[in-house]
Amino acid sequence: MKRSVNTAPQKDVFVFRDGLPLDNGGSLDGIRIAYRTYGALNAEASNAILVCHALTGDQYVADPNPVTGKPGWWYGVVGPGCPIDTNRYFVICSNVIGGCMGSTGPRSPRDPALPDDAAGVELWGTDFPSLTIRDMVRAQKKLIEHLGIARLFAVIGGSFGGMQALQWAASYPDAVFAAIPIATASFHSAQNIAFNEVGRQAIFGDPNWNGGGYWRTGHMPERGLAVARMVAHITYLSEQALARKFGRRVRRDGMGGETAANLFGEMFEVESYLRYQGGAFVKRFDANSYLTITRAADHFDLAEEYGGDLAAAFAGTKTRFCVISFSSDWLYPTAESRHIARALNRVAANVSFVEVTSDKGHDAFLLDEPDFHRVLNGFLEGCADHAGLAFNGFGGGSALLRVEAS
């Protein structure tokens, strides 16, 4: 059978046979979690950091991605001598369940005993159960226990990963010494949901969609998935970043396939860029996984089970928090991070809030932002001192701005 998306090598995979209870009332059996680790776990198992990936990320946070060949998505942030220093910390990153890089998801066999590449295997497809971020975190907790870690030194994540970090702190406060939610929110807004729905409708409208059974034909809904990625990618940028990188510059080389260039003899550089991003995305991601994960994000509302009171989700927490936002992020604007910080202040949590000035938009946390790196390192240094992990400072250390979220 022709496979529509490459998958990661099964080098680090944890399989647990016991059923994972899901928030929808069902369960998922024979779950596989693909993960990577960096650094060494100390004798006390007290130096472990869980890094949670963003919406379409994966476990390859610091080493080359086997599908794209590109460096890890947080290369330069995670590694020896980096802000998340693997000479000091044992760093774990797993592919969320519902994903398509080795963890159980829509592209997995219905029969968990069968390998993905078994001839004629029936995949989950659109019958894969709906998931919540809490389900994903529940599976991560199983992995952490499997690794012999009772308490994580820190949980860190940006965007969709930040939601996972918040869920960890709410669901397992005794298992998290520090949490760093970055460029994120405690719930998905109507605008967030709207952008995701445009992407989903593009996938549904692709002629290869086949009711979600495209894997039977070997023809993936590439055009629809590419458009979904293009729409989403716009939200990751800022107007300033787009103006600086592209402005109104035009390409006249006729490249880009079926585009305005063929109709009008030219194409804006930003059009070419978005088409490139869409084309690259379909080579590494699965459409059904995209649907599963975006719906999980849309249904995220940490305060919902507490009657809309976000502070109640963190009542009594001993976890230390550093909430970080970026000034030009309009996908998860600073107001969302302030909302989280205020809720934590209401329960007298140990919380620091920092807005990093940047014109790079939501994706700033993935880019070269020295101020962000200093904040991240500075907070980890302080937490390490309080936890009894004595390390020398990275790059001379840094001052962490602590403000009240008024």
Curated annotation (Swiss-Prot):
GO annotation, cellular component aspect: cytoplasm
One example GO MF annotation: homoserine O-acetyltransferase activity
InterPro entries, alphabetized: AB_hydrolase_1, AB_hydrolase_fold, HAT_MetX-like
Keywords per UniProt: Acyltransferase, Amino-acid biosynthesis, Cytoplasm, Methionine biosynthesis, Transferase
UniProt-annotated binding residues for substrate: 229, 363
Pathway the protein acts in: Amino-acid biosynthesis; L-methionine biosynthesis via de novo pathway; O-acetyl-L-homoserine from L-homoserine: step 1/1
Reaction(s) catalysed (UniProt annotation): L-homoserine + acetyl-CoA = O-acetyl-L-homoserine + CoA
EC numbers: 2.3.1.31
Single biological process term from Gene Ontology: methionine biosynthetic process
Protein location: Cytoplasm
Protein family per UniProt: Belongs to the AB hydrolase superfamily. MetX family.
Quaternary structure note: Homodimer.
Name under which the protein is recorded: Homoserine O-acetyltransferase
